[in-house]
Amino acid sequence: MRTRTSLRRLQLIAVAATTVAIATACPAEPTGPSVPPVPGIAMNPQLSGGYFSMPWPNDIRRSDSGMNDWTSLPGINTDIFTEPLPPIPLLPEIVAKGQTTVNQFGRQTAVFFQANVELAAASLPAPDQTTSSGASVLLMDLATGELAPTVVVNQERADRFRPAHLLTVLPYPGHPLRSDARYAALVFDDVTSTSGDALTPSATLAQLDQPYDPSMPMTAAQHANLAGQYTDVKSAIANHTTHQLSDLVAFTVYRTQKTEREWDAIVAAMADVPTPTVNVTSTGACTPSSRDVGASMSIVKATISLPIWRNGSFPYLFEGGKVVVQPNGKAQQFGNRTAPVELMVPCSTMPAAGWPIVTHMDGTGGDEQIGTDIPIARRNGVLYGKISPLYGDGVGDAGAILSPLGFSSPRAQAEVLFYNLLNPDSIRSNPLQQAAEQLMFTKALESFSVPGAPFGQPGNVHGDASKVMITGHSQGAQTLPMIAAADPSIDGVISSSGSGGQYHTLAHSPRRLNTLSLVTNYADRLDELNPLIQVVQTVFEASDGANFANDTNFLNYTNYDDTCSVVETGLHFSRAQNLAIVPFTAPTSYGSTALDNGSVPSLPVQGNYGGTTRVSILLPGGHFNYMQNVDKSTAFQDGLFATGIATVPVGPYGYSSANCPGDRYDDPPRRFGI
């Protein structure tokens, strides 16, 4: 059985983990006064100076089958002689599996260079300066010469996960790099030590200008790859910077993932699947809706058959969950599942073309039941459908494993499964499967038609496929950009607590830290720029909402004190979606007002993005602020359906302290982990 197999596997791995210890070296005998190091940055392909003695990422650290060396990341093993085992001692195995899930690097992840001295913060560029061709540290698109805005910091505090003097270059949050593009990170000699000494060029640079020699500290293949990179870097410096080649201290070149690959494959395969039928199982009486003033509505219970786009067996706690892209570019289907759904049908005169269609997906722990839910927008005059978020209608046999670990409620178990840090394939594909299910449900409602008699209407009651909106909260909001990108006919999106750049949530949300504590005893060290967190983001990139651009009408709510979708991830999401941020409280910043929010429009806003309306409202308060703004969301929805033009109305906008359990985590004094 799946439960016994998983438990037995966990026990065997736990026993195996007890044989792992971190090797330590005895200190050398003192030999006299130490000689100060010549300031520089390591570029050692053989990693003789540690994991980051070769910049990460770099294309020599990958292959077509995956990453080459994630299992050597510092801090992932446990020394059983000096440290207690974490509750699930699987981190080395998880990382080993993670490095097979991707074969290119992240669009939103950091670059790490290891210096041998403390660097002067004043010699590093501020975010606004990183797009200047003369900045001391640059991140460049090699195909176009475009400079990416970044946050450049020197991490001086060493811990089990990283060495000291770790120069870190993070794409500015909300400004992801291009998909499937080669980037070069460049460090120049106007970066100095705290003593004022300029960094000296890595000795590797001179070796790359020479024919390969076996005495060089690299293989012939590494030399050939790096020499090719260096040729491209030379051209980039000459053509797109004000620096001289002699200014260069160190570089790294890498390709970003084609993050849309799996999602495009699923969408292409869905086109070959007949639109499923919404199979009605019961039709409720027409009754007044307490949440939809003046409306008489019927709740219709139904089921729908949905394709499964992941291999393996549900619920994918430890294994399975991979999206398999076939040679024809389409995702392989692995059967179907029957999902419960509910509809709310107006008991009033239907427009000639049918009812406008709205589908909704709730947050983690939610389900398909409409009941007394507080909707994002009122449902008067629309055909409203609700589908469960992934794992909201069942967690399979995972409960037997997770309950003894403290995750006893279905909601807690659903969260562990959706944000599944125990299975890299699953954490990467869960949002893809979820997005596919809401998209297919939306398509099914576009062709939904039933006799109108139960609703007091002649003929049939049906939807109007020319007027469609998708909505979601939290987990359900995270995947809305994918759906909108896949189906440009969707007229609008209303998103509550949308999230992008999931490394923010991993670092700050108390619930994600609780999950991380299953596999490491050092979750308090997992700040935003922790390399392990950046590796997780690399795996997650294919389903991060920040990577899926669309241009439909879009209203989002971000909440400053949110402990589920933390404010950093909400603003990251908003920027990446090109949503104009209207702040009702001071926004957080990574150092650049211009990069945080190019312009702040005055409400009301209409057609601010090429004719469509795209706005994110930043509010004080907690995770459920959308409940305080149903009138505003309704105005956005109804105006769009009535006129084809969406308007974000004037305030005031409400907020409350209602929130997820727990307090957000910050690594004092660093709110952002930088």
Task: Give short role names for the model-derived ranges.
Residues 2-14:
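Bacterial N-terminal signal peptides that target proteins for export
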Residues 22-25:
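C-terminal motif of bacterial Sec signal peptides marking the signal peptidase cleavage site
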Residues 29-315:
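Acidic, low-complexity Ser/Thr/Gly/Pro-rich repeat segments typical of extracellular/periplasmic
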Residues 312-338, 350-448, 453-456:
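Cap/lid segment of the alpha/beta-hydrolase catalytic domain
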Residues 457-474:
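Alpha/beta-hydrolase fold nucleophile elbow
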Residues 471, 477-487:
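Short glycine-enriched nucleophile-adjacent loop
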Residues 492, 498-570, 575-628:
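The feature captures the conserved acid-bearing segment of alpha/beta-hydrolase catalytic domains
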Residues 613-674:
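Catalytic active-site module of serine/aspartate enzymes centered on a nucleophile-bearing elbow/loop
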